[in-house]
Amino acid sequence: AGIKQERDQAKYDKAKKLASEINKIKDRIVKDMQDKNSKIRRISTACYLIYRTAMRVGDEKDPEEADTVGATTLRKEHVNLTGSSIEFDFLGKDSVRWQETVQAVGHDKQFHDNLKELVLKKKNSDEIFDGITSRHVNQYYSSIVEGLTAKVFRTYLASSVVSKYLREHDSIKKSNPAEKLYHAKLANLEAAMMCNHKRTIPKT
């Protein structure tokens, strides 16, 4: 347990440092989604998917975990592309259903176009990012920021949701300890929902 705590602490410490690097990371991913090299396009599109939805990487799991669908193991049947949106629907970790719709506007339009290209001529049971694994994703992330991995990135995305919630509810600093705890739980719930973890609404 102690080793896991140390690993988690290191992950959180790295995630905290990402706040100042996030624009650099996003800009590089967006640029590479238009690269002429198809492998770079595939890797950066998988990385954008994780950035955009906080989805797990897919083929990276603890020994006691069952195989689950994630970014690199996503199949054509898990994604529905309309003219203006991307709809995800699949069972993720702990058999929790992951449903999310991303509108194809701004950078998400390039994301939509890349996915459209990737699913072309594929069967429903085919993986969208064929040939791309967590190793490729993590190598790509760490080429932008040293030590950055998909797990660290998801930790950053979750912690930024918590920080945003607490900033928006700044008045709770004057609240009693029970109210503070309740809001802390709500903030964590929002982060858990973004990461598609199983969580229940805290009791008051």
Predicted regions and their residues:
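Extended accessory and catalytic-adjacent subdomains in large enzymes
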Residues: 2-204
